């Protein structure tokens, strides 16, 4: 197919694999080719190349049968059929990114990853989602030591072959301009960038001062539920070394036992 060199799905497209494996060297298609205007499906899923759609309705059936919502449908009939979101709406389900994996052609692609890299340029690493207690299995794909894409790793006993948009697209926050990349110390009402040695030494002096003046009960450690098991273990070791017994991770003012 002529679109393959410019299609974002090139190299991992089922239609491309079948065409190369079983297709002829020349096309017998003589009819006028369809040209479909791209649809707006939201900030995560790109439907700019809907002329490639083969109307398999995988995306429609996924949103209805797996996600449990009706946000995508087949409009019109015959050669005028189009896959589109409901009029005046976009795809908002928290599982919307899975339609990208389900699409067997390059009709539905990832907006954040669009034209970022080819599949054969990416290195793959297996990992587990840290965003909730489910522990969805993931494949993190990197290029030039930078995370470029996150895909589901099939595990029938946990997440099957689906992942939430939170797991799929949260990697963008790793390199966001608003994320702190160096420690900061506040002095005279202003924040200043410092190196890690200076920051850790400042923390040590502050803790020593508080413990010396107000006892250990004046110190508490607040861990994040997003931390890994290894990070929480080190947090506990730090608390034991300081003799601190006040440790918590609850961010909401509610009884965690409920």
Task: State what each model feature region is.
Residues 1, 14-51, 61, 66-100, ...:
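Ferredoxin-type iron-sulfur electron-transfer modules in oxidoreductases and energy-metabolism complexes
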Residues 8, 49-50, 55-56, 60-61, ...:
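Catalytic alpha/large subunits of respiratory electron-transfer oxidoreductases
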Residues 12, 80, 227-229:
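Surface-exposed, flexible loop/turn segments at secondary-structure boundaries
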Residues 12-16, 172-173:
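Extracellular/mature segments of secreted proteins
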Residues 3-11, 30-32, 160:
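Intrinsic disorder at enzyme termini
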